[in-house]
Every structure is written in C-alpha cells, then in structure tokens.
C-alpha cells in the first residue's frame, strides 16, 4: 500500500474534470495537498491517529470545496478509511491483550504501538469519527442475524463493543469509498489507476471481514478484488495475483467448512497461486543468471538469491497446502479446534483460531510483498448503503 503516497497526484488528471468540481483556488488545493502529505508521513510512521486527523481535515476542506458527493473526495476518503482500519486494528490488539482476546489478523504483518485517543474536530457539523458511525440497532457486526448471537453480543463487555464499533466506522468509510471509486471507474473506463484502486478497496474490505472472522463476506470481497486485479496485471507472473488467490482460498476454506465445495474452490485458488509463483520463480532465476554473467555486484546478487529462497519456500508451502486440501488433511479450523480440545480449552475464546488465521494471512501478504519490492516505477505509480460487513449486499 505504499503507492498511496502518490494517490492524489495520480488521479488529478481524471478527477479534475468531474462535473461537480467548483474550481478551487490554488491556495485551497495546496492546503489539501499539504494536509495529505502530512497524513502520508504520519501513516508511514504508523502514527495512525495523526494520519486520521490530517486526512480528516483534508476531507473537510475537499467537501467544502467540491461538495460531499463529489468524486474529488474519493482519494482522501480512501486514505482516511485505511487509517481508521489501522486504528481499529490497534485498538483491537490493545483490548485483546487486556481481555485475553484474539490476536489481530494484521498483527502478523505489522507491529503497533499503543494508540492514543483520536483527535476530535468538526466535519459537516459532526465529529468526523462519528460521521460514518452505524446506528447500533442496524449494525450487523454488533447484532448478527441469529437471536442467540444477538443475546451474546448484547452481553458482551463494553470494551468488546468498542472494538466492534471501530471496525464498523472503518467499514462504513471504506464502503463509501468503494461506491465512489466504482463511479470513478465508470467515469474513466480506460484508467488503469482507477481499476487498481477499486481492487485495493475490495481487498481491504476483505481483510476487514477476515479480521472479524466474517469469512463469507471476505470471500465475496476478495473474489471481486481478484477479478479487478486480473484485469490490470499480467496474470501469469505477478505475485500480487498469487497473493490475491491465496487470500481468497483462505476465506473460502473458513466459509462453512462443512461444505466440501468450498474446500474444492479453495484448492483451485491455491493451485493458481502456486502456478503464478512458479512463473515468477523461473523469471527470477533467469534474472540471477543474467546478472551473474554480467558481473553485477555481490550485494545485488545476494538480494536476488535471498528472494529466490523466499519464493521457493512459499512455493513449497503452497504445494503442501494443495495436497492437504485435496487429500482431506484437517482444515486449519479443524486442526485448531482439535488442539484446543486436547488441551481442554474449548471453554475459552477463539484466540487460537484467530492466530492461525493471522499466520495464514501473513503468508498471503508475503507473496505480494516480494513483488512490491521489485516492481518498476510505473507499476508503483499505477498502484498508487449502509449495511455492515457481517451480511451486507453492496449497493451503488
């Protein structure tokens, strides 16, 4: 997601022609860009509270200039939503440590400091962190479909409810971003940047659903993210696609584990992830051979060799995962539950399952991480209602 630092610049050419733009002054534009730059710096330093504050102020100014429905707002809204998601992760981790609750999925990829309170500021007459808050009566995270689950939720601790509300707020902002970005793709059908952004949004919505263990919704969003990525990337040799296939496989495996069709579909995506990774590995091996022949420096050669080792290890894991899915090896959930039973831990929370999911998602993100370090400048530049994530159907 490092490409988002250039988000505002990448999309100016498209968004500047929006019909609802009110021709802001150059000083207004500079003020917004300065706030976004400050937010980017805070985000890069994992100071997500500061990032939310800066992006929120930029969003205030953008809405006051262009109007709340303008596509001009979508880029800042995306950055704002990503930061809210990271804060939800942080708060979930802090509460999890205090309550002995589950580890965050994203903790597997990043470490976080204990967050401070989000700063308050006004936005269209409301605090910005409350602008997208879901009414608890309508929140499908806090109030699942089944009556028994509703009772459990109502009896949940205030800390747990606060954790869920953080994810609700992030979800609502990201889902609004999805709606705006879908319109941008329709408005600029030839723009690769807009399609990549939409794929990124669906991907993050999928990760959010994995965080709250809503695997069915995660499957839907990650499937859509994969479809968009396949439209803009080389299908045969891009590890971002390998990552996308593996994430979707993970979500499918956990979606109704008793349904054998889900495991079969998961296996297909793991096989595809392995196939893509094998192509990447072959290309990298040829690259190492070429550089050796040209007498490249040892440091560069060592980096390439290290990448090859990581790729081979990941490929081996994917191939083993394929065998497990094909030949009836215990699923990740079954293995965890069996271990919990052996240890007489069935009365405790689902932290072990969440940790296992976290490790699997880490492996998926590692697949994409390898290519993110190697992508060209052009690729890096390119990458730059109201229903909750439990059971919503998206509406544009």
Curated annotation (Swiss-Prot):
Coiled-coil region: 267-329
Gene Ontology BP annotations: CENP-A containing chromatin assembly; DNA replication-dependent chromatin assembly
Record has Coiled coil as a keyword: yes
TPR repeats: 32-65, 89-122, 199-232
Alphabetized GO MF terms: histone binding; histone chaperone activity
Known role: Histone H3 and H3-like CENP-A-specific chaperone. Promotes delivery and incorporation of CENP-A in centromeric chromatin, probably by escorting nascent CENP-A to CENP-A chromatin assembly factors. Required for central core silencing and normal chromosome segregation.
Protein name: NASP-related protein sim3
Organism, scientific name: Schizosaccharomyces pombe (strain 972 / ATCC 24843)
Gene (UniProt): sim3
